[in-house]
Regions:
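C-terminal accessory segments enriched in acidic
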Residues: 2-56, 60-70, 104, 195-214, ...
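Conserved beta-strand termini and adjacent loop/short-helix elements that scaffold enzyme active sites
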Residues: 72, 115-117, 258
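Proline/glycine-enriched tight loop/beta-turn segments at coil->beta junctions
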Residues: 73-80
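Short, solvent-exposed loop/turn elements at domain surfaces
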Residues: 79, 92, 290-293
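Short hydrophobic beta-strand that contains or immediately precedes a catalytic carboxylate
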Residues: 82-85
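Di-metal (Zn2+ and/or Mg2+/Mn2+) metal-binding site signature of metallo-dependent hydrolases
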Residues: 88-96
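Active-site/substrate-binding loop(s) of hydrolase catalytic cores
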Residues: 92-93, 108-246
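A short, Lys/Arg-enriched amphipathic alpha-helix followed by its capping loop at the start of a domain
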Residues: 97-110
Length: 377
């Protein structure tokens, strides 16, 4: 009898090990495929060239921190702009705004540089325990397009472990240890730092080398976050941002202007203005899939921005932006970013006498009442 019990226990142990191994293999394959997924971007006729970010820091070459920089040169000389399409890949409207520029637009005068995947490593994983979708899909003229819904931070496989306290360089400011993998806390970057700091360093060097006049960093945040539907500008860019914001408001786009805090370090709108000659502006839109009050985190929420829990929160005064049963669609969020870019270009011409002319940016109403797919290949 004792031997029979032992045999049964051994069998149960073996079965548990086999099941555990099977689950591990399946999960491992899923993680591996997602980490190595190649998102397709189809450059339009406006793209005149491209290069890898590692040209500005060879240590990035061959790593997941390297990423493509698209160049769109105009027929005539003019000012330049860098668009950081998505610093945080769980904020998809910036990514889609950048891709629509690359795929749909052309440049008449000046030069536009676009980095659709500013933190490339963060596209290779999701935030743990958030139950986020891996992908979202759009129907375009070329068929179903698949885009990655990634993480706010660099993949731990590329940069680990997080310190208890992250000390920003060169300010010496102490931040939460997890911020060491946040691209928007690492500027101006460190050439021999961790992967995130190296990516920041390369972007900063690109701005210096190309003498970028305007840098736009595109973001999203939860509807309950105070700095939302806003531009955040360095003091050097405040006049430019103010004028562009007024243009947007005349178009019916409700948006606010926030000054870059001089003592909060590592962010684009602070460090790029302090360490380069560019005029840095960060833009925020509302994204319910990014917030703490959301319900099911799925592809539908990412694209439509409709969530019953945020509707209830808004009714009770817990949202910082207007929110109703129509949600905040990907079209509305992308429209905000592209409208901001359009007016920043126009107002730069008014202030400095040289215009960056980007052709093909849809108006706010065209996107709001149409489909984002119309501006993708």
């Amino acid at each position: 009898m004792l031997e029979k019990i032992r045999a049964q226990k051994t069998l149960i142990t073996v079965l548990c090990l086999v099941i555990t191994l099977a689950i591990t293999v399946v999960a491992g394959m899923d993680f591996y495929q997602f980490r190595n997924y190649q998102e397709v971007i189809i450059p339009g006729e406006g793209v005149t060239g491209s290069f890898m970010l590692s040209e500005y820091l060879p240590a990035l070459k061959g790593t997941y921190g390297d990423t493509t920089v698209y160049v769109m040169e105009g027929r005539t000389d003019g000012p330049s702009m860098l668009v950081l399409g998505v610093t945080h890949p769980n904020e998809p409207s910036g990514h889609m705004a950048a891709i629509s520029l690359v795929e749909h637009c052309t440049v008449d005068s000046g030069t536009l540089y676009v980095i659709p995947r500013a933190n490339n490593s963060a596209f290779t994983h999701n935030d743990a325990q958030e139950a986020s979708p891996h992908f979202y899909h759009l129907q375009t003229a070329s068929g179903t397009r698949e885009f990655v819904f990634g993480s706010r931070a660099t993949n731990p496989l590329d940069q680990w472990p997080d310190p208890d306290v992250y000390t920003h360089q060169p300010s010496g400011q102490n931040l939460s240890g997890s911020e060491t993998r946040n691209l928007n806390r690492g500027y101006p970057g460190v050439a021999n730092g961790n992967m995130t700091e190296r990516a920041c360093y390369a972007i900063t060097e690109l701005i210096k080398d190309k003498e970028i006049d305007i840098t736009v960093d595109l973001h999203e945040s939860s509807p309950e976050y105070p700095t939302i539907n806003a531009m955040v500008a360095h003091e050097s860019a405040m006049e430019l941002a103010s004028n562009a914001l007024l243009d947007m408001m005349l178009d019916g786009v409700q948006i606010s202007l926030e000054p870059s805090p001089p003592t909060l370090h590592g962010l684009t709108h602070r460090e790029l203005g302090d360490f380069t000659d560019t005029l840095p502006v960060l833009m925020e839109t509302a994204n319910p899939s990014h917030g703490r009050l959301r319900g099911a985190t799925n592809e539908e929420l990412v694209l439509t921005g409709k969530d019953p829990y945020y509707l209830k929160a808004a009714e009770n005064g817990y949202a910082w932006v207007p929110y109703d049963e129509n949600g905040v669609s990907i079209e509305e969020r992308v429209a905000r970013h592209l409208t901001g870019i359009h007016y920043l270009c126009e107002e730069y011409g008014t202030l400095y006498g040289e215009t960056l002319s980007i052709v093909g940016i849809p108006s706010y109403d065209e996107l709001l009442n149409g489909s984002l797919s119309d501006y993708l290949n």
